[in-house]
Each structure stands twice: as structure tokens, then as C-alpha cells.
Amino acid sequence: MASIDIAHERKTAATAGASARPHLAGLTRPLLMDALKAFGLPDNQLRMRAGQIWNGLYNRGFTDFERMTTLSKELRGKLADAFDISRLEIVTEQKSVDGTRKWLLRLPSGIPGVPGPEVETVYIPEEGRGTLCVSSQVGCTLTCTFCHTGTQKLVRNLTAGEIVGQILLARDALGEWPDGGRNSEDRLITNIVMMGMGEPLYNFENVRDALEVVSDGEGLSLSKRRITLSTSGVVPMIERAGEEIGCMLAISLHAVDDETRNRLVPLNKKYPIAELLEACRNYPGVSNARRITFEYVMLKGVNDSLEDAKALVRLLKHIPAKINLIPFNPWPGSPYECSDWEQIEKFADVVNRAGYASPVRTPRGRDIMAACGQLKSETVKARASERFKGEKAAAQPIA
């Protein structure tokens, strides 16, 4: 059996999608204090109460104010009437034979009775670490031709709370809160990668605020060295990302010349390779200790020649970098094939001999469409499938 499908419906307070109460998850500390001040808390209590709520949200994983017993019963009731701290709705959960887990999440729509859009989050367990792949948008505007998400039109940006909410929900599922019976030092989620659905730099403020919450030392406490933001090359935002977010940077490069990259990553027509690499050289904090990762999907007969490998080495000269070679993960209707494994190894050898670390990413979660480049909202997949069936039926001759 390729995968275990544990599809289930779990209705939560978030399911209604129309709560008029503002959600506290994802608010930075200053914004949380602003919300509590507007709520009516006196100035001399703001810092203390914000700290207590912060601890409840991000150290204990509470989804109900009643569990925040450091607050008075009266205050807990008033907070519950004014604010939401529930989780996103899990529509389905799938588990791969390799341990990878994927959650399809429904976001609030803001309209009573109307289901909200959906987004996917993936957890990848490895020896000694666990990586959570987080989405920043529903759909994407970039239409990268090798990426499944790129075939789904942008629906909307995620809020900071919805970005942080993916991490909170994953910690729930993995039993990673103190009450989950797990040693708090034995973390299952050790790394966060902003490599899910969407282009993070086209949702800059929400991604920035979410990662500020995630890296706060008194909450989820993930070091910025364990957080990687991947961009397809939104050049004007790269320097700002280094200054205001300061996490590790990954570039979806995938080609060594503008003609090829224009086809694979149409954004390249706006920000060509030379401009992108110049922005990388100037990325704040880049050094041999904080190298930029260049992602390179291996496409048979497109970008995988040994000449391409040599050109890649020349391009990245004088940039502290590592190169992540990604075997192409197929999806229905994709126009590409994965490079032969022998060719991938030869390509990696050229890069390695030039002095660059070039690990070949092991495909994870392919059987549940959770691997790199395979994410897409399930409702969009279903609509496409129904449309295909309808077109096929219409094409059948009438007896």
C-alpha cells in the first residue's frame, strides 16, 4: 500500500470561518499588547497579561482560555468573548510509508456558512531532525512550470496567524506540547522551511510577523538559523528580508541561463539571473557560516547536462552557497521527467569537486503528493479531476 489515508473531518471553532473575534495567534508581542489595550486592560497589566497569554499559546499550546489558570476566571471569560485562539480546521491528514505527514487545512472564509480556501502543510521526519514545510499563500501567482502549486491561481495570502497556526497544529498532531508526554528537549519539529504553497516574499509582512513569533525565545523558540525562507527571486524584497526577518535564505534557481529560467520560472523575465545573484551577494549576514541554499530541480534533458553543472559553479562564484539538487517529483499533467539517477550523480560530482556542498534531496512523501513541487489544494485537484472526467465523457461517441 503506497500510503495510509487518514482522511477525517474535525470540526473546530475555526470551522465556522466567520468568527468576528480577532485571533491572537500570530500577533507579535507589541501587537498582542495593542490588542489587549484596545480590549480594555490597564497599562500596568499589559506586559504581565501578554506574557501569560503568550506562554499559554506558545509554550502550552492552549486553545481555550479556561486552561490559562494564571489568569482570573473573570478575565478568562472576558477574553474568550473577545478573542479567538482555536486551531485551523484539518480537512484530511495523510501519512506516507516513509513517515512524511501532510495536512490539508481549511482556512476561515469570513462568511457564515461558506467554506474557506484550503492549504497544505507537510512534516518530514529525518534522523535527528524534523522539518515542517509551511505555506504562505493559497495558490501562487508565479506559474513555475515544474511546480504543481503554480497551476493553481492565487486565492489569497495567509495571515500571520494562519502561518503560525500551521506550526501549532503540527505540534498538536505530534504531541510536542509539555502535556503531550514528550520530553520538552526532544523536539520533533527542529526546522521550519517556508517552502510550501506560495511565494513568501509576496506576503512579506505576514511572513515576517509570523517568523518573529516563531523565533521568540520565550515561545516556540526556533532559532533563525533553523528557519529557511525560499523565494523564486523577488529581487527587491531580498535585502529587506535579510534586514527584517534575518533567517536563512534559499533561492529557487533551477537554471543557469535566462532563456531556460524564463521557461521554468517566468518571474525571471522581470528579475533575471544576474540581478538575482547580485541581490544574493548583498544579502545581509551572508557568510560561510550562513550560506545561501540554491535549489535546483533536476529535469531530464532540460537543465541537467554536465555543461549546466559547470555553468552553475561559475555562476555562484564568490557567493557563500550550498546547492540542493532536487530530483523532479512528478504530478498529473506535468510536462517534465526527472533526470536519470546516474546523471544526477554526475551533476553532483561536478559541483562537489568545485567545493560546493551539493546534497541530493531524497524525495519524501511522493506517494501522498507531499514532495517538493507537488502541493496543491485538494478542492482544486478535485475540480480539475471532475472537469477532466466531464471532458472525457463529452468526447465519447454517442451509441
Swiss-Prot record:
Active-site residues from the entry: 120, 372
Pfam families: Radical_SAM (PF04055), RlmN_N (PF21016)
Annotated GO biological process: rRNA base methylation; tRNA methylation
Cofactor detail note: Binds 1 [4Fe-4S] cluster. The cluster is coordinated with 3 cysteines and an exchangeable S-adenosyl-L-methionine.
Binding site for S-adenosyl-L-methionine: 198-199, 230, 252-254, 329
Catalytic activity from the UniProt record: adenosine(2503) in 23S rRNA + 2 reduced [2Fe-2S]-[ferredoxin] + 2 S-adenosyl-L-methionine = 2-methyladenosine(2503) in 23S rRNA + 5'-deoxyadenosine + L-methionine + 2 oxidized [2Fe-2S]-[ferredoxin] + S-adenosyl-L-homocysteine; adenosine(37) in tRNA + 2 reduced [2Fe-2S]-[ferredoxin] + 2 S-adenosyl-L-methionine = 2-methyladenosine(37) in tRNA + 5'-deoxyadenosine + L-methionine + 2 oxidized [2Fe-2S]-[ferredoxin] + S-adenosyl-L-homocysteine
Cellular component per GO, a single term: cytoplasm
Location of the protein in the cell: Cytoplasm
GO molecular function: 4 iron, 4 sulfur cluster binding; metal ion binding; rRNA (adenine(2503)-C2-)-methyltransferase activity; rRNA binding; tRNA (adenine(37)-C2)-methyltransferase activity; tRNA binding
Cofactor: [4Fe-4S] cluster
Keyword list, A-Z: 4Fe-4S, Cytoplasm, Disulfide bond, Iron, Iron-sulfur, Metal-binding, Methyltransferase, rRNA processing, S-adenosyl-L-methionine, Transferase, tRNA processing
Binding site for [4Fe-4S] cluster: 140, 144, 147
Enzyme Commission number(s) from the entry: 2.1.1.192
NCBIfam families: rRNA_mod_RlmN
UniProt similarity note: Belongs to the radical SAM superfamily. RlmN family.
Note: Reaction proceeds by a ping-pong mechanism involving intermediate methylation of a conserved cysteine residue.
Function: Specifically methylates position 2 of adenine 2503 in 23S rRNA and position 2 of adenine 37 in tRNAs. m2A2503 modification seems to play a crucial role in the proofreading step occurring at the peptidyl transferase center and thus would serve to optimize ribosomal fidelity.
PANTHER family (UniProt xref): 23S RRNA METHYLTRANSFERASE, RADICAL SAM CORE DOMAIN-CONTAINING PROTEIN
HAMAP family (alphabetical): RNA_methyltr_RlmN
Protein name listed in UniProt: Dual-specificity RNA methyltransferase RlmN
Protein species of origin: Parvibaculum lavamentivorans (strain DS-1 / DSM 13023 / NCIMB 13966)
